[in-house]
Swiss-Prot record:
Protein name: Probable transcriptional regulatory protein NMB1648
Organism of this sequence: Neisseria meningitidis serogroup B (strain ATCC BAA-335 / MC58)
InterPro entries registered for this protein in UniProt: Integrase-like_N, TACO1_YebC-like_2nd/3rd_dom, TACO1_YebC_N, Transcrip_reg_TACO1-like, Transcrip_reg_TACO1-like_dom3, YebC-like
NCBIfam families xrefs: PRK00110.1, PRK12378.1, YebC/PmpR family DNA-binding transcriptional regulator
Alphabetical keyword list: Cytoplasm, DNA-binding, Transcription, Transcription regulation
A GO CC term assigned to this protein in UniProt: cytosol
A molecular-function term among this protein's GO annotations: DNA binding
Main subcellular location of this protein, as a coarse class: cytoplasm
Subcellular location, record wording: Cytoplasm
GO biological process, any: regulation of DNA-templated transcription
UniProt family annotation: Belongs to the TACO1 family.
PANTHER family: TRANSCRIPTIONAL REGULATORY PROTEIN YEBC-RELATED, TRANSLATIONAL ACTIVATOR OF CYTOCHROME C OXIDASE 1
Length: 242
């Protein structure tokens, strides 16, 4: 199965994530706390917590911070009660946006999200206005040059749903959300190290943006990601920023 080129987008995303690394710990602590509250403190039986712990390890979060977040979630330590919220809307060129938040103040969060949309050329929509265009799935990206047949065999044996070869030669392994961490671990054990991966909401129909429109859309995404209550921003936009 073939896919479009996304190598440049991956590199661009990584550069932006590195620039925002100061906020990553705060978001991870929130996610670990909520995951532990919803499904318990054992990552073996809690896929959401396992994913959050994978991300914490990738970002070198101190183990004490991780354990405190788990303890707050399970009630062993007193902590803030976060509410999960999802907002949907439209960006430049009608590109779809989904914004996931964890907050202790819904009124503040919706005001901040609406302001970010309005100030940057977008529109906050109603519940369900773009959700139909997204599917919840995990993905792992491998550099061009990896033996496609061998990787496909290992991935499918590990429980992956699909393997996609992109136009630029990179290979993408698609998983069910709860299987992502297990597939990643199995492939690493087989000698396949991914260069990018996550559990995401992926747009089924994408919106290509270039020039000023791409720059404006990036500004809107950045404004949303910079909000303290925002955990993740998903979009149908494919940005050609070169």
């Amino acid at each position: 199965m073939a896919g479009h080129s996304k190598w440049a987008n991956i590199q661009h995303k990584k550069a932006r994530q590195d620039a925002k690394r100061g906020k990553i710990f705060t978001r991870l602590i929130k996610e670990i706390t909520v995951a532990a509250r919803m499904g318990g403190g054992d990552p073996g039986s809690n896929p959401r917590l396992r994913l959050a712990l994978e991300k914490a390890a990738e970002n070198n979060m101190p183990k004490d911070n991780v354990q405190r977040a788990i303890d707050k979630g399970t009630g062993n330590l007193e902590g803030v009660e976060y509410i999960e919220l999802r907002y949907e809307g439209y960006g430049i060129g009608g590109a779809a946006l989904m914004v996931d938040c964890l907050t202790d103040n819904k009124t503040r969060t919706v005001a901040d999200v609406r302001h970010a949309f309005t100030k940057n050329g977008g529109n906050l929509g109603t519940d369900g206005c773009v959700a139909f265009n997204f599917v919840h799935q995990g993905y792992l990206v491998f550099e061009p040059g990896v033996d496609e047949d061998a990787l496909m065999e290992a991935a499918l044996e590990a429980g992956a749903e699909d393997v996609v070869t992109n136009d630029d030669g990179s290979i993408e392994v698609i998983t069910a959300p709860n299987d992502w961490a297990g597939v990643k671990s199995a492939l690493e054990a087989a000698g396949y190290k991914s260069v990018d991966g996550d559990v995401t909401m992926r747009a089924q129909n994408e919106t290509e943006l270039s020039g000023d429109d791409a720059v404006k859309m990036q500004k809107l995404i950045d404004a949303l990601e910079d909000l303290d209550d925002v955990q993740d921003v998903y979009t149908s936009a494919v940005l050609n920023l070169d």
